[in-house]
């Protein structure tokens, strides 16, 4: 095709594509498909030429003049096929209520943009506009092991609860995985805090599958979102989890590691946050607990600040407690319970609360034995206290004060 014919064809193609999504967005999506694993190269090309649309005009020879010989991805030279694929990708994402947000958008997260390996763009699935989700508010990433202990779960919930006492309300960022991630997401949702789940799959699928209901709850809650820089249809491959950790670390001004082995995914996220010059916090644990080895290692190496209580954690983050404190809120709810406003006599409730407070992890059978109350009565009280957010219950029906 001659140069004149190509230019005419290119203009017609561009005009046709501009109508639905905007040509620059389609070009950015195309670059993400071709260079998603090398975002720094895409960013350099855009900076050099001024726009993704200008990048898509180049042929192989022109690209090699900029990047050097033998450095051009074959996918990048098939412009027509790549642009058509990108347009289909945007339509597919839209079917799931997702938009493609790129670094040229005003709503693209400012802290993420600072990272040298920031994604070219990412898909955002939410009932809110990106401008609302990534508005000027604190973002705190909370990560850790999938095999979270009762101690880790309790402190994860406490620390998220403490975030609910500050204003403006921070956004809790995590990865939707088992254990620590989902604990942080659910506690945030229960307290009305915004939360973002960064996924290692396409925006059209949820991993793990048992978290689908949680993911849909996040996507349908105002101010919350599911995000991914992977195209639709991407499977949950191991390397995808490693790469998505950079987004979890990059979105936030601080990362909190709850529990992790020395080589856990949470450790990787914490190290990335440290490399981005962000604040890193870690929950110290027993020296003989494998799940705390990563946290203790970071603290010992001065890569992370030890979290010893909720108040100092908030102070270190520089967050102002502008709303009712979580501790005061919990005490007020307990007073309401003890006044007989919840499920029966205050004396029985006080007995249950005292036993749970003194015996962290006590199960229902032991509560029945020690309280002298009937099983049905104990079960009803515990359920009511859980609904009030005063105690937490795990899958084994073990109880703890929140």
Which residue stretches match the model-derived regions?
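Cysteine-centered motifs
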Residues: 2-7
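Generic detector of N-terminal low-structure segments
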Residues: 8-12
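Short, small/acidic-rich helices and loops at N termini and domain boundaries
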Residues: 13, 17-107, 388, 393-397, ...
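Glycine-biased, small-residue-rich flexible motifs in mid-sequence functional cores and linkers
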Residues: 16-22, 102-402
């Amino acid at each position: 095709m001659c140069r004149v014919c190509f230019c005419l064809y290119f203009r017609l193609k561009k005009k046709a594509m501009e109508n639905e999504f905007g040509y620059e967005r389609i070009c950015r999506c195309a670059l993400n498909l071709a260079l998603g694993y090398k975002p720094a190269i895409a960013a350099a090309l855009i900076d050099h030429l001024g726009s993704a649309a200008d990048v898509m005009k180049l042929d192989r020879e022109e690209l090699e003049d900029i990047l050097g010989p033998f450095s051009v991805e074959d996918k990048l030279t098939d412009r027509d096929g790549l642009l058509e694929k990108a347009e289909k990708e945007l339509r597919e994402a839209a079917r799931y209520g997702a938009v493609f947000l790129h670094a040229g958008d005003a709503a693209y997260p400012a802290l993420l943009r600072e990272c040298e390996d920031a994604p070219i763009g990412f898909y955002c699935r939410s009932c809110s506009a990106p401008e609302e989700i990534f508005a000027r508010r604190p973002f705190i990433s909370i990560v850790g092991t999938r095999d979270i202990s009762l101690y880790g779960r309790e402190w994860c919930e406490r620390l998220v609860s403490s975030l609910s006492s500050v204003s403006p309300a921070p956004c809790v960022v995590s990865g939707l995985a088992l254990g620590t991630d989902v604990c942080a997401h659910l506690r945030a949702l229960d307290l009305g805090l915004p939360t973002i789940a960064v996924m290692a799959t396409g925006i059209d699928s949820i991993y793990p599958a048992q978290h689908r209901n949680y993911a849909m709850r996040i996507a349908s809650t105002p101010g919350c979102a599911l995000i991914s820089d992977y195209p639709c249809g991407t499977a949950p491959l191991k390397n995808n989890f490693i790469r998505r950790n950079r987004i979890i670390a990059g979105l936030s001004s601080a990362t909190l590691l709850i529990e992790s082995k020395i080589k856990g995914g949470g450790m990787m996220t914490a190290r990335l946050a440290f490399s981005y010059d962000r604040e890193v916090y870690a929950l110290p644990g027993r020296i003989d607990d494998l799940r705390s080895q990563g946290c203790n290692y970071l603290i010992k190496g001065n890569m992370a600040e030890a979290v010893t209580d909720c108040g100092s954690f908030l102070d270190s983050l520089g967050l102002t407690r502008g709303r009712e404190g979580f501790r005061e809120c919990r005490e007020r709810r307990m007073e309401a319970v003890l006044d007989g406003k919840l499920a029966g006599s205050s004396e029985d409730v006080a007995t249950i609360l005292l036993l749970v407070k003194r015996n962290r992890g006590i199960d229902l059978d032991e509560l029945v034995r020690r309280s002298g109350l009937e099983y049905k009565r104990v079960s009803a009280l515990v359920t009511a206290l859980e609904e009030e957010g005063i105690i937490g219950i795990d899958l084994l029906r073990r109880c703890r004060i929140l």
